[in-house]
């Protein structure tokens, strides 16, 4: 359950119910074997992102935002090493699929999965932090009327993502794309949470936002891979292989940036005030 319902319970109690459901699912995921192709680490981090997306939507009316957002951020950070390990393999695999050259095949062949017991301590730390958040979630409450909070939250998440897209376009720096990636993800969570107000219309929005998130996510992963290679943390035989890998990454980054800006023009075409009016009109007329 990751949806506000315009015909459902009051927004204040719905906020708590969604949060508690996500927290309980996150804790349950830790005890489940990996049967979906997604790792426990992937699922744990996905839940924390959804929770933080929820908090950002209600931030204008939630006094506990800073404390709980920081707690969830720290929980996710406890898994960052495991996440980086997994993503490195997936990034190499995706790059090899895009351009199947022998260098990438060799790097993939030399990349091994660490033993599962290496995950135990970080996962235990993650669980401990999530249990602490879960213990407080039942007392979370909004300090502003629900509709007022949602309206301010929609405006804030959209405006932030739109501004960061423009920064990425103007400055073309990896950190600017990283900031845009995070804020676009948050805006996607906002629209997903409000989707029941106009399932068909907002469903189309979510689809394009997801495509943009995928392009920006691949971009970020490749930037990290490029830094990892430059720091000597990949089994490259010498400068020639480093230059070859760097050139491949640079070419792919250029393609992803072009794709991201094209999708961004669709997602962020409206001014923040107009977008907010449109979304809230769906909610009020549902």
Predicted regions and their residues:
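Function-determining surface determinants
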Residues: 1-286
